[in-house]
């Protein structure tokens, strides 16, 4: 995943 996507997923988790 892209850094931005990973950041969004990290926020959800």
Curated annotation (Swiss-Prot):
Q: What's the source species for this entry?
A: Vespa analis
- Cell compartments where the protein resides: Secreted
Q: Does Secreted count among this protein's keywords?
A: yes
Q: What is its main location?
A: secreted
GO CC annotations?
Answer: extracellular region
Hey, which family's this protein in?
Belongs to the MCD family. Crabrolin subfamily.
Where expressed (tissues)? Expressed by the venom gland.
**Key words, A-Z:** Amidation, Chemotaxis, G-protein coupled receptor impairing toxin, Mast cell degranulation, Secreted, Toxin
What job does the chain carry out? Answer: Mast cell degranulating peptide. Induces the chemotaxis of neutrophils. Its mast cell degranulation activity may be related to the activation of G-protein coupled receptors in mast cells as well as interaction with other proteins located in cell endosomal membranes in the mast cells.
Q: Does the keyword Secreted apply?
A: yes
Residue positions where Leucine amide is found in the record? 13
Instruction: Tell me the protein's name.
Output: Vespid chemotactic peptide A
> A GO term (biological process) for this protein?
chemotaxis
Q: Which GO terms describe its molecular function?
A: toxin activity
């Amino acid at each position: 995943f892209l850094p931005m996507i990973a950041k969004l997923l990290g926020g959800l988790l």
